[in-house]
Structures are given as structure tokens and as C-alpha cells.
């Protein structure tokens, strides 16, 4: 028990209780959609009566409660129950006079009365255990007390005999009452004769000291927040002091009976159906309850003190009690019984007991009550459960979040966002201000000591005048309540915003952007559509905020654009606006508003004080009234003038001073005590503000309370000075000179500011000061902006004074010990060179500078570096006249003082003097030469012209000279340098502007140019298809024309073919014929294979296979050869026209000095001219020969199977062709638009020139083949070209390069121009000879003696039909004509090995692999692979072919 009572002041919370509380909260959690269920309420805890510390005599047990048995009839009416309770209380008080009885302390003055009981034997609400009435007078018999005890025992037995039923099946009130009865049964045993040693109840922690209540830290929130005095808006009752007596002497006749109040209380049958109705119903209950409390206090003031009970604050701080009370509140009427009003008068009795002497009876009762003050847990339940006139279960009440305790009501201060204030209830007010006047008004005015206490109060009030001043000055913010206590709260809520606004003027814009939703509705739209009542200030506030945000946003944009200066221009001066009548009227209204406010405060204070005086006088006894009266009399009407002196000399309280007390000087009177300061209007400060600072001259008048509204004051100089300092509210004055109103603040001063103070630099002034001349910055000045004036140099004292090294007064000692520094030149710097001495400008020295130089040399002992640094000006730009180098200073000093005789003879100084003399002589010689030359020019000019002679410019010397005044041209040089720099910058700027203009123009032009639409792949495919269709159409037309011409020519020559074939097939022909090959198989001359009769088999000509296997045709002019483009059908045919193909001989031996075959030799313009001339002649000859042809033989078409047979027979050719032909045949595209065929030598023997010419003429080959001769500016597509060299037999060369190389070898000393001219002549001769040969070859070809049968190597697309004119014979490769441009040519990596197959411009020419040997391929037999490479060529040269065909 000792350990349990030791913690009486702590909050009761154990693990079991926390578990029950958590279970209850989870079951009624409104956030989970659950409603309040009373069945989840845990059982209430009962609190035991602490053990008795001092028990003298065992007395009759005082019952703590009077329960009603559920088996008996309903309880009696209210008056009867009240009378019985009074008797029980009286008997208990009588026993307390003689002995100390430990009893539970009462909570309520009046016990609760049980109402009518229902027929189902439900327990009625009963009194809480531990509630007892104690009276100071015994007027009740003892048997009634015994009867009450017997009834208590019966009620306990009946209660215990009831069967246990589930809580869900019982009525909430029934369950609650049974829990209470159970607790009561445990608390008070029925067979115990006395309460001397009671048993503990549920281990309740009690107070260890008598008279000290158990404090609970937290007051539980009431579920019905406004149903009683202990709602969440009402603070917990203030605990009484341990030393305060809890009882007082009150006569029994002054005890107020609750009959009159209870008679007016009726049970409310209203049941709310909506949450709003529930809130309004609770608010009405709260208002009515407060009205009853106030009326009860007023009634108690007239009947005497109402405190014979004390409220103990050790109420359980649990939600269980609150929920039980909430459940029991369903049977409570809207108007509570007087038990809930009684605590309000309790503190007054506690305070009153301090000043009243206790009688023996009162002391005995006080001791009985102050032993222990405990309250049973059913106290609040008893308050809430009153008698119910209507039996039966009450209708269910709507459960809301407020009623269930999930949320609580907010006070008006919380809703308005004001600083939280501790509410002062009427219960706490006597504790907060404990004044004797309060106790006098509480009902002790009948005491004989009241007047004396009133006089003591005056002295106490005089002491209160030492508080801080509460004078309110104009233009001063009204101090809010509790300034000192609420500083932290304000700092947390609003000080941060104010701090941000002071530091950053853009804070308003930031808040507007931060709290305004980006896509939400603006505040303006919300205000325009608001459903609440809005004033003009609300709209103006939003308008002002919008205007500020617009201004700040503009400022923010200008700041980012570097266009917002920190200092703004001052507003332009405008004439002041003349004041109008409206301004005067507004000024009158302002000061009248202040006057009326202050006057109203004064009237309120005066009326309150007068009312308090009247109340005090009425409630006082006759003796006190005599002390309160003012000794005055009504002056007679005949002598009104006598009142003045009498009132002037009389010392009276301020209550009688009806006139102005300030006009009469008399001593400070004793002020009449006024009422409490809490009832003053809210506009006036209730208490002295501790936040106000001391005034300049603190005086008593500034520390008066609010109730002291009049006082007397001596008109001393100090008082007059104080009054003069007070603000005076007067209307605007009219200036006598201008007859205009003289305003304190101009009408436009509020908005017409000079500049907007957006930063600290806005209103600040920049002070300029005269700086000292710039000085040379020392190497020890580390700061860039440091100046000597701000940090003056302070000479530090030496650390050691016993060192005489740097002290000037010890210099003579140093000179004796150590000889002075000897004379020396500035040897640390090299001696000036002779060139510098000749070209330097003389330095100028004034007399003052010479003297300074002497003094420095003497002071620093020939330290020329230090002397130079002292004499060098501080400017960074040093002119020649101001040059002060160490050697310059030494030279000047030597010129003034002269060198010592011993030093001038040394070799060092001799060299120095010699260098200076030599430089001087050279300078003089140069000046003399320039002067002589100028004179000669003048003489020549005078002889020829009468021009004026130019003045001779004499150059000054190079040695330092003395001047009286040095003319400084440094500023001129600086200006010139600045001008040049500015001009340079302007030039650069102009160039940049010009470039930017050009760029802008170019950009505009480029933007205006229409861009071609971006074609899709489908568009490209469509264009390609259309182009191919056009090419096929043109090719088909051209093919039909060529077929018709061939048929006509073949038909015309049919009669001449047999004779020519006999001449060509003869084995014993002239040497110019092709040698006979005995190994060749016999060939018939018929056209069995589809060949025309005019074309014979090449094997019959005596040549192996007729032509080498690798001989191909390069298609240069498609309209001549009749080549077809890709994708179209091709009739492989060849015209027997002699001009259709020309064969060009190739030398059997290549010369080492000849150009490589794959290199172009047309680098010089002469070669190009020769090539163009040759191409022109060839074109003329070709046209002439084509026109002379009478007819052509038709060419039959070949079938695709024959083409396949031809391909299969190709690799089966005998190897003798490789042995016979060892040259490198190449077909080169020519600009003459006809194919060229390079014919190698046969079997290493030189070919006959006549035969080669015949072959060339018969094959339609033109010679010489040249690059870059394509018409219409189309370059030669192929990088490889055949470069046939000169024949070993001396045949005519066929290329310009070979002709030139041959001429240069024969004539090495011949100039290049002659070589070119001779080359051109030989070329013309060659062309004439070839023209003659062509006519002969044409005749032979027409006769069929020379069968030049090309092999058309077909592609594998099936559209190309080759010609098989001979079985096993060589094929001439003809590619497909592709429609590619030469620009789309892709270089092949294998051009050396594959020219005709992989996209080479040679278009299918079979090219042998080049030999790796140094031996020319033309001299090696069997080294050439004659096999052709199948495949269609993708040469870009076919584009030019298609163009030619289209032409």
C-alpha cells in the first residue's frame, strides 16, 4: 500500500489499461467506417479509500453512496431524497466534531437522485461511491443514518444476486449502473461496523499528505463536449493549496436548496437526426448550462457562500470514464442538476478560509475533510445520470464524431488562427486574481474585518503602481495579450514570414507562385463566386496582392535582363496637391475616432468601478458601510461659492470628484478599491503589459490599474512636463499666412514615395571621397583593392633592442667596425649594349632629382637597384625622359660627381667609357650623314623647282641631360594609344556587324529558298521505274532502226562476199596477212550457226579462234553499236560495217620509260588540244564512211539455249590461244564514241602494220585511243586505259605519249614545244594513212575475208541473247547498258584483276591478271589468262550510252 500511495501524483496507466483503451479505440475508429458502440466500453475502475492516518474513536460508518435496490419500488421524489441526504450529511458532520473520521471527499454539493425505475428491475442511476454531504451543524437523528446503511447493505445484496447477462443484451445505462454497484459493493463492505480500517479499492494511488488532492496531468475529453462544465473547452479545475482549509463556518439556514433550480430543469426529448442538428443541440446545451452556472453564482452571492464541498482533481484520465459518461448521457436531460454547478463556488471558499479565523467546530470539520480528498470513479457518471421522469429505454441518440470523441470542438481563437490563450473559466478566476475585494464580494461582507481588509487593499494597490506603464500612444500597435508568454508561439507561426519579407522583397511573388496551383482556379474567380459574405477589404486584399505580384514579376524580369538598377531615379518633382474639404474631413474623423475610443474606455472603467463600489457597499455590514461613506454634505443653495474652497482643500476619494481633477492641485488621495479587472471590455488591456518598455520618465500615473479612472495630481513642473509629452488629439490647424490647413502628414504622403525601396541601396547615399594619387603597388601588397589610406602603416617596435644593425644612430660605430660600402657600379645588371646606347632617348633630370639622387647614393651606399626603385615613377607607362634604370642612375651620378681616379683607369670602366663614346660618335655621324643628304636634296629641289627647303631636324644626344622642367608627354602618348585602341575596336565591331549582316541576309535567302520535298523510297522507286520505261522505249526504237539498217546493208553486200572470203582464207598470202595456223580446225563458210553469209568463221582465217579469248568490246557510243539498257530484250547482233569496230595494235614489248597503261597522259593543255583535234577528225571520218556504205546485212537473233552453250564452251577452249597471245588486251572507252580494241602481237612476232591497220579498220576501232575526249563534258569513267606502245617492227605509234617518248628518245635535246608540234604532225600523217587503210579494210570485210566476230558475254538475267557465230570460238563481251550516272561510280578494290566484271567502265572486258615479273607481259608467252569473266557490268558509263542513244 505504501508503494501504491507513493505515486499518487502520477498518471494512472498500466499495461492492462492501455490494452483495453487500444481495443476500445480500434473498435470505434471512425476513420475505418465504424460507429460508436457502447458495448465495447470497458468496466470502470473503482478507487479505494486511503487508510486512516489518525483515528481516535471509531464512529458510525458514513455511507459513500445510497444505492437503490433494483427489487424495491422506484426511488422517492426529489424533495424526499434530498431530505434524507441532508439528514445523513448532518449526522456525519455531528460526529466529525468530536472525532476524526476518514471519509471520501465530496465532489458535488447535492447528491444525484435516482429516477423512476422500469418494471424490468433495472438498476437506477445512483450516487457515486465516496460522495458525502458534510455540514457544520447536526440536525438529523442517528436512526436515519442506520437506516441508510441498512438500505446500502440491501442494495449490495440485491445487486450481487442478479444473474450475469451479456453486455449486449442489457441497456447501456443498466450496464453502467451495474458496474457502479459492483464497485460500490467492493468499496464499502456491508458487515463492517466502522470505517476505521477500510479495505483498499482497486489499488487507487492516493495522496500521501492530508488535504492534498491527487493531480491528474491530463483532463479527459468529454464525449459530449458541451454537456457539462468539464468539456474540452473548459479547463481542469485548479487544485487547492495543501495549506488551505477546505471547510468554513456556514450556518445551516444559509444552505441553498436545489428545489428551486431543479424544478425548472426538464428532460429534453429532442433527438437529433443529422450531424448539423447534433452540433446545434450540443451548442444549445452548452449555452444553457453556462447560463445556469452564472445564475447560480449570482444567487449564491446573496445567500452566502456556497462552498461546503471540495472538488478533488484526481479524476481518472481515461477514455473509459469518458465513454461511460457518454453512454450514460442518453438518459440525462438537457438541463443538468445543480451538482454540476457547485464546483464554481468552491475556490472562493478556499480563498475565503485564509482570512477568516476558524471556530472549533470549523477546525474539527476541516480536519475531517483534509485528511484525504478522493473521488470515486463514478463521480462524473453521477453527474450525467439524473432522474428520468419517463420510464423505459430512451431513443437512440445519433452518434457523431463529436459525440464519440473522435474529434473535438475548436475554440473561436483556433478557428480564427489567433495565438492560443489559456481560457480563464469562472471557476479559476478567483485563483488567478486573489484579491481581498474578490473575497469580500464572495459573501464575507458581513465580517467585521472587511473594512480593515479594504484599507489593506489600498496599500497593496499602491504597491501595484510600480508596474510598467500601460499608456497607449498614437501610431502604436496595440499589444496583444500575453506578449511575453506568446513570443515563441508567434515566432513559430508568423515571425518566419515576416523575416522572409524583410530579407527578400520577392517573397510575396514566391508565395503567390508556390501556393497557387498551376492549373487551378485563381483566388479572384473564387472570390467572385463565393457563397460567403465578403467585405470590401477582402476584395481589396486580393486586388492589392495581384498588383504587387505584377509589379514584382516585372521587377524580376528586368533583373534577369540586367535592366533593373539597384538605385532608381528620383520621382519627378510635382507641385503639392492643394488640400480639399475631403482631406480636412478625413483628418477630423481620424482624431475624433481616437477621442471616442479613449473616452469609451474611460467610461467603461468608471461605470465598472462605480458598480463595484455599490455592490461592496450593499453587501457590507453597518460598520463597514460607515467606513465606506464619504464625509460630505449637500451644500446649501444660497452659498454655492463656498463649495469651491472646501472641495479644493478637502482630501477625498476620487469617487466624489465629478469635475476635472486635473484643474485643482491637491495631494494624492486614497483610491477607492474597484472590482476585478477581468470583466473589463476586451478592447482595453486587462492586465499590465509586461512587454512594454519603461517610459522616459516613469511615474505613478502610468502604472495605475484600469479601475482607477480618476486621481489627483499636484501640478508640479515634473507633472506638467509629463503631461506635455502626452499626445494631444486636435483637429487640423489653419495656417494664418496661407489660410490653408496645416496637415501633419500630407494627403499624398501615404502613396507618393520618392523611390521604391526594393533594396538597401535604394535610399542609401553613396559617399565619394578624394583618393590620394596612385602609388606603385608593392610586391608585398597581396590584396588587389587594398589602399594605404584604409590601413595605415604602423611601425612596429623592434623585437630586440640590443641589435644595432639597423639603427641609424649606431651607423658611425658600424663604419668603424666595418668599412663603408666601396664604390661599385650596378654589376648585378649587364652593361648596356652599344645598340641600346645608340638608339636610346636621353633621360631628363631636374635639379631636384639630381639632389635626390645624391642623397640616395649617400644613404644606400651605391645600392643602385634600391636607388632605381626609389626614383622610378609609380606609373606603369614610363617614357624615355623618365627612365630611371640602375645604369641610368649610375651614369647620371657619374656625370654629376665623376668617377674616382683609381676606378676610371680599370679595364671595366674603360670599356664602359669606350662604349659610350663609340655610341656618341656613331650618333653624330648618322646625324651628319642625314644632314648632308638633306642638303643635297634641297639643292636638287632648288635647281629643278622653287620648293622651300625642309628644315633640318637635329637629334638630341643619348646621354642623360639636365632640364629645368621636364615636359611630360606621357598623357599625350596615353591618349594616342587609347585612340588607336578605340579605332581598332571600332574596326573589329564594324567587321563583326558586317559579318552578322551578311549572315542574316544569307539566312533570310536560305530561308526563302524553297526546299525540295523529301521523297520517300516509294517515290524513288516510281521515278526509277518511269525512267527505265522510257529507256526501254528508246532502246526498242533504236533496235528496230539498227535491224533495218543491218538487213539493208547485208542484202546489198550479198554478191561480194564469196570473192573476198577466198582471198582471206588463202594460206599463202602476202606477209601482211595473218599467219596460217595448221592446228586450226576446218571451218565451213556457210551460215549454219546463224551467221550471215558475209561473215566467216574466224578459224578459217588462219588465226587461232580468230581473236584472243579475252578480247572484248568497250561500248563507247551505244547508238553506233546498238547496245541495249538493262531490263530490256537484246538481240545480240553485230554490224558487219567496217566502221563499226576498229582494232588498235598494241606493241609486243613495253618500254620501261613509257607511261603505265592505267595512267592518263593528258595533263598538259597541248595534249588536250591534240586529243580534241584527233577526235574531231575521227568523228568526221566515221560519219563519212557510214554514209558511203550502200547497205548492211541483217543479223539474225540468237536463242537463249545457244547463249548457255556458248558459256559452257568458253572454258573448254584449247590452250594454244594462250600460247599464241601473250599480250594484255584492254578495251578503253574513247571519247570518239566507238569501241577500241587493242590487238596484241601473235606468238611474240611483230605484227604487220598493214594487217593491224586492216584489223583496226575492219573492227571499227579508231586510233589513237584517248581519255577525256568524251563529248558534252562527260569525263572518262574508267581509270584503266590501254596504252599501246610502239611496235618493235617500227610501226606507227598509236598514242600521243608513245609518239612523244619516241621523239624525245631520238632527239633528247629538242625543246618540249617542238616535240609537241612534231607529235601533232605525225598524228595527222597517221590519221591520213589510216583513212586510206580503212577503205581497203572495208572492202575486205565486205568480201568476208576478215571475220571479226566479237563474243558477247551475256548476263544471267535471261534478257540478253548472245550470238554464237562459231562453235568453240572466242566471244566478245558486251555488257548491259545501265542507266547510272558517272557520279555514282564506286571504285572497286579489285580493279587490277577485274575490270569488266565488277562495275568497271570497261563493261565486261575480260582482263588478264597482271604479271608480277619484271618482264613485260607482251614478251612472255602463255602468261595471260584468256578466260573471260561472266557477268553483267554495272558500269556508270552506261548512263552516257543511254544519253547518246536518246540523242
Swiss-Prot record:
One of its GO terms (biological process) is chromatin organization. Residues 60-271, 300-443, 636-689, 923-970, 1003-1023, 1180-1248, 1381-1447 are annotated as: Disordered. Keywords: Activator, Chromatin regulator, DNA damage, DNA repair, Nucleus, Transcription, Transcription regulation. Residues 150-173, 219-230, 305-323, 353-369, 379-389, 1231-1248, 1408-1447 have a biased composition (Polar residues). Residues 569-644 form the HSA domain. Residues 841-899 form the Myb-like domain. Pfam families: HSA (PF07529), Myb_DNA-bind_6 (PF13921). Gene3D superfamilies: Homeodomain-like (1.10.10.60). It is found in: Nucleus. One of its GO terms (cellular component) is nucleus. Residues 231-247, 925-940, 1180-1230 have a biased composition (Low complexity). Residues 332-342, 428-438 have a biased composition (Basic and acidic residues). GO terms for molecular function: chromatin binding. Belongs to the EAF1 family. PANTHER family: E1A-BINDING PROTEIN P400 (PTHR46459:SF1), E1A-BINDING PROTEIN P400-RELATED (PTHR46459). Component of the NuA4 histone acetyltransferase complex which is involved in transcriptional activation of selected genes principally by acetylation of nucleosomal histone H4 and H2A. The NuA4 complex is also involved in DNA repair. Component of the NuA4 histone acetyltransferase complex. This is Chromatin modification-related protein eaf1. The lineage of its organism: Eukaryota, Fungi, Dikarya, Ascomycota, Pezizomycotina. The gene is eaf1.
